[in-house]
Regions:
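Glycine-rich N-terminal segment of FAD-binding domains in flavoprotein oxidoreductases
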Residues: 435
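Extracellular beta-rich repeat passengers
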Residues: 1-151, 156-432, 440-465, 469-524
Length: 524
């Protein structure tokens, strides 16, 4: 139904991946350090947020900036790098970025002078008409941030931002996105200032995965680089994955680099890569090309980086004809660069892999991307365990196959149920979070005789226990063997056909048994 709060008389329609600018965004302003210089190169220390200004806003302190939208420090608010602007956790921000003026839109999440006392984690921004998230100075730290199909930069940094960030994920919009990151050091009248009051942006970024709009995209006149450096930007980017951008890996403006460093990053496909010279993915002044942290003067990777064009090994990755990503499992395969190449120490959370994802897909369960079916669950271990053959024995007392004893099924293996298994009294079957179990059935060629059917199932008898305690991010999955075959693209011997899959759909049932738990409480 139509609601009275919008300006039309139409119910909906529901926004899509292409739809942005339908409302504003979320803006948080604090009193931590920002770098905004005057014409003499001295840091002013505060600024007014871009986006919109209410007509009734008042400048009480006479600094030319209306007070309600100021951020940073001044005579009213002392500098507080531990500023606490609140908590934003498990929040999805969708279809915002209202255009308040020609070329002036609102970011999905804007953080102006926000300090380390603020919690920003597990946040998603989808299809925003401007940047996904922008840091204007401040010291705030973030983790588990996802940007999907935003129409400008995914991660924008400016004005002396110095936070520490881990587990950033970006998928660019193929028709209007700019860079994965637009990263600036300082703003104001004298960006080259050497005044001691000016500290340029120098964040620490670990475990990012940036996916571009695809190398053949033609619908946008914007940058389509993994990231752009400007205004003396300094940072340290480590243990990250950058892939499938139409232009350069790094674009650097003439005054862009201000102490930038990087190590142990996987460099994927880029439109500018000529197939032979790693330096072709750098769109930068000669000074940066000569001393860049990625490749030597002869183009050899240094500081643990890969060659350009390295496959990041995503477990699933498909696009439609318009360039939109339609399916991704960003967890890398076990033999891929993000899994096997070295990582740098020092990240806030230990992660023995490059990029934003290891075994756990933290997008599942709470994001728009998952709800829309864009997040595939295609990473499966290589080791298969035939439970009937290896973990059960015939029990003469019960006349069935029971577990040989209490056991734990671990997430680094696949468990195959070719028939019923029983957990009898005093036995405990423990299943780790993230474990996948696949069942089969075999009617032995006698469709009308059910007595000889073999049906994968788990039956917990009285006195036995099943401890299957999954998590939001690592659920335990029981499924049909056809799903495993579809993911691997090969037929397995445990079912009765010679076909790989096909993957079951919402209409498909009856492919295995189920889960049965029997207790000894009162029944009537």
């Amino acid at each position: 139904e139509d609601h009275p709060w919008d300006v039309d008389a139409v119910a909906g329609p529901g926004p899509t991946r292409e739809t942005g600018g339908l409302w504003g965004g979320l803006i948080m302003l604090g009193s931590a350090y920002i770098a905004h210089t005057d014409s003499n190169g001295v840091n002013i220390g505060n600024n007014i947020i871009e986006g919109f200004l209410p007509a009734t806003a008042v400048d009480n302190d006479g600094d030319g900036r209306d007070d309600i939208l100021e951020y940073g420090f001044d005579e009213t608010f002392a500098r507080d790098d531990a500023d606490n602007s609140g908590v934003v956790r498990y929040v999805s921000i969708r279809h915002g970025g209202y255009e308040v003026g020609d070329g002036n839109e609102i970011n999905g999440l804007t953080l102006g002078g926000v300090g380390t006392g603020t919690v920003i984690e597990h946040v998603e921004v989808v299809s925003n008409q401007d940047d996904g998230i922008e840091f204007f100075g401040g010291t705030v730290n973030t983790s588990y941030i996802s940007m999907m199909f935003n129409q400008d930069d995914s991660f924008d940094i400016d004005e002396g931002h110095t936070g520490t960030h881990q587990f950033w994920f970006a998928v660019q919009n193929p028709n209007s996105a700019d860079n994965g990151g637009e990263w600036d050091g300082v703003t104001g009248g004298s960006k080259s200032s050497t005044d001691a009051s000016v500290t340029r942006s120098a964040p620490q970024i670990y475990n990012a995965t940036f996916v571009g709009a695809g190398p053949g995209i033609t619908g946008s006149d914007k940058g389509n680089n993994a990231f752009l450096l400007d205004d003396y930007f300094a940072a340290n980017v480590q243990n990250s994955v950058f892939h499938d951008f139409a232009e350069a890996f790094v674009e650097v403006k003439s005054d862009g680099e201000g102490g930038f460093s990087a190590s142990n990053n996987t460099i994927g496909a880029f439109g500018d890569y000529d197939g032979a010279n790693n330096g072709s993915v750098l769109d930068a002044p000669v000074e940066f090309v000569v001393s860049n942290p990625f490749f030597s003067a002869t183009g050899t990777p240094i500081n643990g980086h890969t060659n350009a064009g390295t496959d990041p090994g995503f477990s699933a990755y498909t696009r439609d004809g318009s360039g939109y990503l339609t399916s991704i499992d960003p967890r890398p395969a076990t033999d891929s660069s993000p899994r096997t190449d070295d990582v740098s120490a020092g990240a806030p959370a230990a992660a023995a892999y490059r990029g934003a994802f290891g075994d756990t897909n933290w997008l599942l369960g709470w994001t728009w991307a998952d709800a829309q079916g864009l997040v595939a669950d295609a990473l499966v271990p290589a080791t298969d365990v035939d439970v009937i053959a290896s973990q059960t024995a015939f029990d003469a007392f019960y006349g069935v196959n029971v577990l040989t004893g209490s056991t734990t099924w671990t997430s680094d293996k696949i468990y195959i149920l070719t028939d019923r298994i029983y957990v009898k009294e005093d036995q405990v079957l423990t299943i780790e979070p993230g474990t996948k179990v696949y069942g089969t059935f075999d009617d032995n060629g006698t469709a009308g005789n059910f007595s000889d059917d073999k049906v994968g199932a788990v039956i917990v008898a009285r006195g036995g226990q099943l401890v299957a305690d999954g998590t939001l991010e690592a659920p335990i999955v029981f499924d049909a063997i056809q799903s495993l075959e579809a993911v691997r693209g090969e037929d397995h011997p445990w079912d009765v056909d010679a076909v790989a899959g096909p993957a079951p759909t919402r209409e498909t049932g009856g492919l295995w048994g189920g889960l049965i738990v029997l207790g000894r409480a009162c029944i009537a």
